[in-house]
């Protein structure tokens, strides 16, 4: 009842609709604070990722900003503006949900303190740093800033949940680490590959590792269990788990500085300084200039948009397919476009008129298979939107709606 004027968009065009399915993608026009309250009953505790790029606070007046909002806030006004929205947004997050907020230097410390108040300091994860431009401002004779910050909090921090960053190369790595406590590890027969001659190697201390029993090597493998003592990274339990997963070990010299090698590369956590390559060698995490070129090629009239690749970096790291992603400062629609291409359900909100022209136009191009941004790296190929189940790209549609007039009238009266 809080929303009205529903229109569904799919590969066949625009259609009026009165039905809203549980997994529909939503684009909502209206005051985002009221929209968040309107969404709370249905989506409380269901959103996996909130990704926002709000209007920034600046120390000095700016002629405009990304979203055509008034960016010349007094600090206190801006903080109240953000606090009201972050408090209700927290209710929408799932218990393992994550919120990311872009910000520049002017207000990063104020925003961090505000988010600690709302999400609690213990749930802070990281302030990621992204190089947002290849052409930093040259007006200052003190420094040339070329980065933005993305503050990350979890609703309830969970050490067992790992974010996905870049994949490591499938090379061997040392099992020894200087400074670790010395302890014994037992390596099962056949799990160590030796690059030294076959034969019998007596117990002793050739270097940093102590051989606690005699070792017999045949055809490049240990034919008996090997007991070693050293400053190892792993416990016996972890070693046993790794062996069961196919990990093997390598001894390259008579010093017996043992190394491990997994059968395939592993996924590391994202780094604080965002890597410029992660999707592919051709398409990495780009800059605002990349976003401008992409939008221009689509005929979208919008300035200061984020590239799809930086949004995709976090969507990939922190969500799985069909998780819900929320952006209540949608702007040109980058978060929605990325979520659509990566098969996440999304809710996008904005109050500006460009949502009906630029944002909807962009999302229609995505539905038709637009190949800019991250499309080629992901091999984005949308399928027939009539297939609502059982297909990876079956959710190739979105529903546009507006805040009901009674709610919007209240906003208009307050702003008058």
Language-model features: locations:
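S-adenosyl-L-methionine
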Residues: 17-38, 364-406
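Contiguous mid-protein beta-loop-alpha structural module that forms a pocket-lining wall or clamp
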Residues: 82-83, 111, 116-117, 128-136, ...
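Short, well-ordered loop/turn and helix-capping segments at boundaries between secondary-structure elements
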Residues: 116-121, 130, 155-159, 341, ...
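Short beta-alpha connecting loops at secondary-structure transitions
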Residues: 131-139, 345-352, 412
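Charged, amphipathic alpha-helical linkers/stalks
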Residues: 409-416
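Short, glycine/acidic-enriched loop or turn micro-motifs at the edges of active sites
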Residues: 34, 56, 330, 353, ...
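Class I S-adenosyl-L-methionine
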Residues: 1-324, 356
């Amino acid at each position: 009842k809080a929303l009205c004027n529903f229109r569904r968009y799919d590969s066949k065009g625009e259609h009026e609709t009165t039905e809203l399915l549980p997994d529909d993608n939503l684009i909502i026009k209206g005051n985002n604070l009221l929209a968040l309250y309107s969404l709370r009953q249905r989506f409380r505790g269901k959103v996996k990722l909130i990704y926002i790029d709000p209007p920034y606070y600046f120390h000095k007046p700016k002629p405009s900003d990304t979203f055509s909002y008034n960016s010349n806030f007094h600090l206190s006004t801006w903080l109240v503006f953000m606090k009201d929205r972050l408090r209700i947004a927290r209710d929408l997050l799932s218990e393992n949900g994550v919120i990311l907020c872009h910000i520049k230097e002017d207000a990063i410390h104020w925003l961090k303190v505000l988010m600690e108040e709302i999400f609690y300091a213990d749930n802070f994860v990281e302030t990621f740093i992204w190089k947002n431009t290849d052409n930093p401002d040259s007006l200052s004779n003190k420094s040339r800033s070329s980065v933005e910050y993305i503050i990350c909090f979890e609703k309830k921090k969970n050490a067992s949940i790992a974010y996905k960053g870049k994949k490591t190369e499938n090379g061997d790595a040392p099992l020894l680490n200087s400074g670790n406590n010395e302890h014994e590890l037992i390596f099962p027969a056949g799990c160590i590959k030796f690059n030294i001659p076959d034969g019998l190697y007596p117990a002793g201390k050739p270097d940093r590792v102590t051989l606690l029993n005699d070792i017999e090597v045949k055809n490049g493998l240990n034919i008996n269990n090997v007991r070693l003592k050293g400053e190892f990274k792993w416990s016996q339990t972890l070693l046993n788990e790794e062996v069961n997963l196919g990990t093997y070990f390598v001894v390259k010299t008579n010093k017996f500085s043992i190394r491990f090698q997994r059968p395939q590369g592993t996924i590391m956590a994202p780094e604080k300084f965002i890597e410029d390559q992660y999707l592919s060698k051709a398409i990495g995490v780009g800059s605002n200039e990349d976003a401008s070129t992409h939008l221009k090629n689509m005929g979208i009239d919008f300035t200061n948009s984020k590239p799809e690749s930086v949004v995709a970096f976090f969507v990939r790291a922190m969500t799985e397919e069909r998780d819900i992603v929320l952006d209540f400062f949608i702007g040109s629609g980058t978060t929605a476009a990325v979520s659509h291409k990566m098969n996440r359900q999304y809710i996008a909100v904005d109050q500006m008129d460009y949502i009906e022209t630029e944002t909807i136009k962009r999302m229609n191009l995505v539905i038709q298979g637009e190949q800019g941004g991250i499309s080629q790296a992901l091999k984005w190929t949308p399928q027939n939107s009539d297939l609502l189940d059982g297909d990876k790209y079956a959710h190739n549609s979105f529903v546009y709606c507006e805040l009901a007039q009674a709610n919007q009238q209240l906003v208009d009266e307050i702003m008058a």
